Amino acid sequence: MFLKGYTSNVVLIILTFFILLTKEEKNIKNNISGYCFLNFGLKKNAIIKKREKQNLKLFCYNGIRIGQGYDIHKIKVLDEEYNTYANNDFNKNEQSFKTLTLGGVKINNVLVLSHSDGDIIYHSIVDSILGALGSLDIGTLFPDKDEKNKNKNSAIFLRYARLLIYKKNYDIGNVDINVIAQVPKISNIRKNIIKNISTVLNIDESQISVKGKTHEKLGVIGEKKAIECFANILLIPKNS
């Protein structure tokens, strides 16, 4: 009796499994399963109608690339005591304090410790471009141990990254930048920064966003000892 009931249950399970497989195969052929993934709240008929109306293409990668860049540097405010030179434990080369440059704009009352000109905005954008293109990072391409890069204008790095975009047949969709600093006040120089980035990258100013955030006087940034920047970029294939 037990064996008979067990056999019946096994047959029922196999039959149910077969029906589900057949149904799923039909859904795959009709490309319904993918639509169920995107529109799990809709009934099947509604999904089919929506498909016919919008002619959606699922799981289609069109080559769009996104990159993120970051940079941070030590700073000194001129109304505070500072040394003109400082040793970097992570680098055998001696880095020097120089006038801070942000997006090509000189900030005369703030010094930055760096090997090149220390423009964290340009550096972050370069790194975001390199990341989006799957290239090497800025520190590898332009090492701070190389004397050729000492005090170098970071616009040169940015032009190099722009050339890579051109060679790989991409256009810039937009650039989004976040500067985290207690000083200087970004709103006072935002327009000039955007104009400079627009010129170097050869894109419209409307494609660039520059935002400034303080650190609420917390940590080394809040104590005016450092400044950092995040940059995100969207690259679009020219043939899309």
Swiss-Prot record:
**Which keywords does this Swiss-Prot/TrEMBL entry list?**
Apicoplast, Isoprene biosynthesis, Lyase, Metal-binding, Plastid, Transit peptide
Q: Which free-text remark accompanies the cofactor? A: Binds 1 divalent metal cation per subunit.
Q: Which residues form a coiled coil?
A: none
| Residues under site feature: Transition state stabilizer | 115, 214
Say which enzyme class the record assigns: lyase
UniProt-listed Enzyme Commission number(s): 4.6.1.12
What this protein catalyses is:
4-CDP-2-C-methyl-D-erythritol 2-phosphate = 2-C-methyl-D-erythritol 2,4-cyclic diphosphate + CMP
List, alphabetically, the Gene3D superfamilies matched: 2-C-methyl-D-erythritol 2,4-cyclodiphosphate synthase
- Please describe what this protein does: In the mevalonate-independent isoprenoid biosynthetic pathway, converts 4-diphosphocytidyl-2C-methyl-D-erythritol 2-phosphate into 2C-methyl-D-erythritol 2,4-cyclodiphosphate and CMP.
- The name on file for this protein is 2-C-methyl-D-erythritol 2,4-cyclodiphosphate synthase, apicoplast
Q: Which organism is it from?
A: Plasmodium falciparum (isolate 3D7)
